[in-house]
Amino acid sequence: MFGAFVSHRLWSDSGCTTTCIANSIANYVAFGEQIEFPFKSAQVFIAGPRKAVINIQEEDKAELSKMIAKHNLWVVAHGTYLDVPWSSRSAFVTHFIHQELLICKEVGIKGLVLHLGAVEPELIVEGLKKIKPVEEVVIYLETPHNKHHAYKYSTIEQIKELFLRIRNSRLKHIGLCIDTAHIWSSGVNISGYNDAGQWLRSLENIHSVIPPSHIMFHLNDAATECGSGIDRHASLFEGMIWKSYSHKIKHSGLYCFVEYITRHQCPAILERNLGSSMQLQTALTTEFHTLKSLLK
């Protein structure tokens, strides 16, 4: 279920004021049809991203709900960068996250992505316990990017430890968002097919702890070296993870990720936020044509 991040700044019609997210999704769907890659998923912001402010209006909610149903889209919202329930401001933050979850349910958005912190699993679990759950909406914990912290959640061992604690705490509706650029930045080599395969086989070995029905992906190349700790996305086969495989794409680690995503029907989002809509659509056209060749 491949798709992309839909920024209303880059996707909505000029002059749009009240239904910009729904309008962006309409243009995004039309673009997918134009490049002959019908999108199955999308990611949006309904709040923030840098402030704790809901930015979807009532009229937009109604139109977005219709758009999601009409095109049978799997849509996830990305939480704001302040959505850190294990922080010192957790009382305000957890209330705000609950508001985001309620909006997600109202319009048919399947989940909310939160950035994992580089903190101990027990602190993350305690933070999650403070969030009032909303039925049918999954909180996806996104693998972070860091270099020096003990808890990077880029290794299968640490992911397993965290989700065992989540399961033992009887928390429901908690999933995992694997960002390929982040785990690379945290020191996991997923460049070649065998390298990525080893990591993904280890992930399959803990499906009893975190099932694929609760796993999604941010499918990004990276503009920095493995283990840099820096989060800088690049287009597929244009960054330092997979560029060396651009002429032998089925030997790349990306192909192994595509196989896993297809085998388990996981949503996968390309996160691109370039300077103009033309630049963005040009880059995405190339990337989705490449994905189409990997799916053959």
UniProtKB/Swiss-Prot annotation:
Zn(2+) 2 binds at H115, E142, H218. Consistent with its intracellular location, ASFV encodes its own replicative DNA polymerase and three base excision repair enzymes: a class II AP endonuclease, the repair polymerase Pol X, and an ATP-dependent DNA ligase. GO terms for biological process: base-excision repair. This is Probable AP endonuclease. It is found in: Host nucleus; Host cytoplasm; Virion. Its cofactor is Zn(2+). It comes from the Viruses. Zn(2+) 3 binds at H182, D231, H233. GO terms for cellular component: host cell cytoplasm; host cell nucleus; virion component. It holds the Pfam family AP_endonuc_2. It comes from African swine fever virus (isolate Pig/Kenya/KEN-50/1950) (ASFV). Endonuclease of the viral base excision repair system that catalyzes DNA cleavage reaction at the apurinic or apyrimidinic sites (AP sites). Cleaves phosphodiester bonds on the 5' side of AP sites. In addition to endonuclease activity, the AP endonuclease has a proofreading 3'-5' exonuclease activity that is considerably more efficient in the elimination of a mismatch than in that of a correctly paired base. Displays 3'-phosphatase and 3'-repair diesterase activities. The single nucleotide gaps generated by the AP endonuclease are filled by the viral repair DNA polymerase X and the DNA ligase. Zn(2+) 1 binds at H78, E271. InterPro entries: AP_endonuc_2, AP_endonuc_F2_Zn_BS, Xyl_isomerase-like_sf, Xyl_isomerase-like_TIM-brl. GO terms for molecular function: DNA binding; DNA-(apurinic or apyrimidinic site) endonuclease activity; endonuclease activity; exonuclease activity; phosphoric diester hydrolase activity; zinc ion binding. PANTHER family: APURINIC-APYRIMIDINIC ENDONUCLEASE, ENDONUCLEASE IV ENDODEOXYRIBONUCLEASE IV. Binds 3 Zn(2+) ions. Disulfide bonds join C16-C20. Its EC number is 3.1.21.-. Keywords: Disulfide bond, DNA damage, DNA repair, Early protein, Endonuclease, Exonuclease, Host cytoplasm, Host nucleus, Hydrolase, Metal-binding, Nuclease, Virion, Zinc. Induction: Expressed in the early phase of the viral replicative cycle and accumulates at later times. Belongs to the AP endonuclease 2 family.
